[in-house]
C-alpha cells in the first residue's frame, strides 16, 4: 500500500503548517511506515493511506515519487 506522509524537516521545532512537506512511501501499515522512517531527523505529523481514486489523483501530481526503503 502507498502512504502519504506529512512531516516537518526539523524534529526539534514546533510544527508550522506552511513548512509541512510530504513524501510517498510503500509499506504494509502505518507502523511499518514509522519503522522505515525512524532514525531520520523529521517530525511526522500525519500518515495517510492512499488507495482507489485518491491514489490515482495523487499519481497525477508532478511531486508523486514513491520513496523506496528496504525493510
UniProtKB/Swiss-Prot annotation:
Its EC number is 2.7.7.6. The lineage of its organism: Bacteria, Bacillati, Bacillota, Bacilli, Bacillales. Belongs to the RNA polymerase subunit epsilon family. This is DNA-directed RNA polymerase subunit epsilon. Monomer. RNAP is composed of a core of 2 alpha, a beta and a beta' subunit. The core is associated with a delta subunit, and at least one of epsilon or omega. When a sigma factor is associated with the core the holoenzyme is formed, which can initiate transcription. It comes from the Bacteria. Gene3D superfamilies: RNAP, epsilon subunit-like (3.10.20.730). GO terms for biological process: DNA-templated transcription. Keywords: DNA-directed RNA polymerase, Nucleotidyltransferase, Transcription, Transferase. GO terms for molecular function: DNA binding; DNA-directed RNA polymerase activity. The gene is rpoY. A non-essential component of RNA polymerase (RNAP). Has a similar structure to bacteriophage T7 protein Gp2 (AC P03704), which is known to bind to RNAP in the DNA binding-cleft. Unlike Gp2 however, this protein does not inhibit transcription initiation. One of its GO terms (cellular component) is DNA-directed RNA polymerase complex. It comes from Geobacillus stearothermophilus (strain DSM 13240 / CIP 106956 / 10). It catalyses: RNA(n) + a ribonucleoside 5'-triphosphate = RNA(n+1) + diphosphate. The keyword Cytoplasm does not apply.
Amino acid at each position: 500500500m502507498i502512504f502519504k506522509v506529512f512531516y516537518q524537516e526539523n524534529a526539534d521545532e514546533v510544527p508550522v503548517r506552511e513548512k509541512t512537506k510530504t513524501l510517498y512511501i510503500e509499506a504494509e501499515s502505518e507502523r511499518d511506515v514509522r519503522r522505515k522512517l525512524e532514525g531520520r531527523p523529521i517530525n511526522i505529523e500525519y500518515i495517510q493511506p492512499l488507495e482507489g481514486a485518491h491514489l490515482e489523483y495523487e499519481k497525477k501530481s508532478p511531486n508523486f515519487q514513491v520513496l523506496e526503503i528496504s525493510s
